[in-house]
Curated annotation (Swiss-Prot):
Subunit structure as annotated in this protein's UniProt entry: Forms a complex with ATG9 and ATG23.
Domain MRH residue range list: 20-166
GO molecular function: phosphatidylinositol-3-phosphate binding
Protein's name according to its UniProt entry: Autophagy-related protein 27
Region (Disordered): 161-194
Topological domains annotated Lumenal: 20-199
Membrane topology: Single-pass type I membrane protein; Single-pass membrane protein
Compositionally biased residues, Basic and acidic residues: 166-189
Species per Swiss-Prot/TrEMBL record: Saccharomyces cerevisiae (strain ATCC 204508 / S288c) (Baker's yeast)
InterPro entries given in the database record: Autophagy-rel_prot_27 (IPR018939), Man6P_isomerase_rcpt-bd_dom_sf (IPR009011), MRH_dom (IPR044865)
Residues annotated as transmembrane: 200-220
Location(s), subcellular: Cytoplasmic vesicle membrane; Golgi apparatus membrane; Mitochondrion membrane; Preautophagosomal structure membrane
Example GO biological process: protein localization to phagophore assembly site
Role, per record: Effector of VPS34 phosphatidylinositol 3-phosphate kinase signaling. Regulates the cytoplasm to vacuole transport (Cvt) vesicle formation. Plays a role in ATG protein retrieval from the pre-autophagosomal structure (PAS) and is especially required for autophagy-dependent cycling of ATG9.
Amino acid sequence: MVSKTWICGFISIITVVQALSCEKHDVLKKYQVGKFSSLTSTERDTPPSTTIEKWWINVCEEHNVEPPEECKKNDMLCGLTDVILPGKDAITTQIIDFDKNIGFNVEETESALTLTLKGATWGANSFDAKLEFQCNDNMKQDELTSHTWADKSIQLTLKGPSGCLKSKDDDKKNGDGDNGKDGDSEGKKPAKKAGGTSWFTWLFLYALLFTLIYLMVVSFLNTRGGSFQDFRAEFIQRSTQFLTSLPEFCKEVVSRILGRSTAQRGGYSAV
């Protein structure tokens, strides 16, 4: 029984560690969260002291940077609380760590990427943390916009590039190199053909529309003051004449373009 429990625990730890690799996670790999870390702080007056709260965030193990001195090296979230009394050095009164071996859950919505960290031990208590990354690709670093620490839950909202989807250029860098480019080139050729076909189709539709309008206007002018039946008969007659004369008209246009019209040939005599 003990061996089964140990094996299950070992497997669960391996699963969690692997899931923290953002490039291997189905959702996290789509976002820029693996490129950035942040150290934010807020200051508030707590007379006679000043309290400073700092939050160190480095979600993905691919982004290897050193955390603050008081935090652990494998922390993905670390909270520090410093208290400063007048004329004295700052004293760190609280440190809470969420390392990369704890469980977590990822959720993506239209407005944010949310990462929930579960079960960090702080003294005799267990805490969860909810990190909400809102996209702003005009910012170079993430900024903490709000934070709450109530009961046994911590909520942090950050705005910046981490919550933004990766660009196509980033996806190409993670692709197959030249093979991916060849595939793209082959994929673009049918698009060009489709564009040419679309242009010809629109030209034909415009010509048909203008012809229809022309026949309707001429029929209306010739039957002005008459009944709808007169207009209908005139329109059908002119449409029929147009359709029957269309092949001869096209033949005449082609002949003139190629310089082989009967009028041109009639202007010369054999020597």
